[in-house]
């Protein structure tokens, strides 16, 4: 592994660690009285405004994609990586446990690999890669359960969590042709824009946005939202788009397995939640599985299957 490739891996790891922390900070916002849809909307508004401001200073700034085909692709990214993904994940928490949701949503690298492999021949998993993926999934189970081997099945909640999982898998597929044509700033700005645009029907028909809740927000809540909007959304989505182009969609998406590891570490640090030996064993299995699944004999070609 070259020094530059190692750098890409370290940056990807950092992004996923930050995303893992967002569950803890989102939980704090939920306890403050904000709804899941409000949290998503506010963090994406912050991210979009800042990224738009930066984009306007660039000589290469453009408002629209070169064709409606690519504009629709951007809309698809905004839905699958923005509004629909976050709504499905957060609504799942209303019907099922955090454990179930984490297990299902964070298994998305497996589904993303299978979906991408159906369109890109060079990305299809070999036996060693599939073994590594399964080892990582076992590690994921151990990390999320953290010594409490009890699952409470909920058809509605688990279906919503699986829907969020599939959304991120589709997002990982759609980002490949987008990266071939546009830079990370343009793509990420479009993701935020269409994510916000497509959340509007939810507020019109399901749950109106409670503007009065904004007036009651404390400085601590605003700082929390700024972290989610500036760091976890604007910076992390921007960097994630970039590293998916550099490492390949499957390699980058495999890092999602680390997401619950980061979540539990932050929960231990900020919420005094325990860490067990099962968590440590699961972490080792996740890292081992990721190493095996990244052992590829061919480069990540970007040619679509005809």
What are these language model-derived features?
Residues 1-42, 79, 151-180, 198-201, ...:
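Glycine-/small-residue-enriched transmembrane alpha-helix faces in small-molecule transporters
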Residues 31-84, 109-115, 167-174, 188-209, ...:
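Transmembrane alpha-helices of multi-pass small-molecule transport proteins
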Residues 17, 22, 46-50, 104-119, ...:
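Alpha-helical transmembrane segments of compact multi-pass small-molecule transporters, enriched
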Residues 22-23, 52-105, 142, 229-247:
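Specific transmembrane alpha-helical segments of multi-pass solute transporters/efflux pumps
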Residues 29, 39, 43, 92, ...:
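Hydrophobic/aromatic residues within transmembrane alpha-helices
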Residues 51, 55, 109, 115, ...:
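Hydrophobic transmembrane alpha-helices of multi-pass small-molecule transport proteins
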Residues 15, 39-42, 82, 86, ...:
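Helix-helix packing/entry segments at the starts of transmembrane helices
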Residues 4-9, 33-41, 64-71, 145-170, ...:
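Juxtamembrane helix-entry segments on the extracytoplasmic side of multipass membrane proteins
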């Amino acid at each position: 592994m070259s020094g530059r490739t190692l750098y890409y891996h370290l940056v990807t790891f950092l992004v996923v660690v930050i995303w893992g922390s967002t569950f803890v900070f989102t939980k704090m916002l939920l306890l403050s009285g904000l709804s899941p849809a409000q949290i998503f909307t506010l963090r994406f508004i912050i991210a979009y405004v800042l990224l738009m401001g930066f984009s306007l200073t660039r000589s290469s700034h453009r408002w629209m994609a070169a064709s409606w085909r690519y504009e629709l692709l951007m809309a698809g990214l905004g839905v699958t990586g923005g509004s629909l993904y976050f709504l499905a994940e957060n609504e799942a928490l209303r019907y099922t446990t955090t454990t179930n949701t984490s297990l299902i949503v964070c298994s998305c690298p497996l589904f993303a690999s299978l979906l991408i492999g159906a369109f890109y021949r060079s990305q299809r998993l070999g036996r060693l890669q599939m073994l590594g993926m399964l080892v990582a999934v076992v590690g994921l189970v151990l990390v999320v359960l953290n010594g409490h081997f009890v699952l409470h099945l909920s058809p509605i909640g688990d279906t919503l969590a699986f829907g969020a999982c599939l959304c991120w898998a589709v997002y990982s597929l759609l980002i490949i042709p987008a990266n071939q044509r546009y830079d990370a700033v343009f793509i990420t700005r479009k993701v935020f824009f269409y994510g916000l645009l497509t959340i509007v029907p939810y507020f019109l028909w399901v749950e109106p946005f409670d503007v009065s809740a904004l007036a009651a927000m404390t400085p601590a809540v605003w700082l929390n939202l700024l972290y989610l909007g500036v760091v976890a959304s604007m910076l992390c989505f921007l960097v994630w788009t970039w590293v998916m182009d550099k490492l390949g969609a499957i390699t980058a998406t495999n890092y999602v397995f680390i997401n619950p590891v980061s979540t539990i570490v932050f929960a231990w640090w900020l919420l005094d939640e325990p860490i067990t030996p099962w968590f440590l064993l699961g972490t080792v299995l996740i890292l081992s599985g990721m190493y095996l699944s990244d052992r590829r004999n061919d480069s990540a070609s970007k040619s679509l299957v005809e």
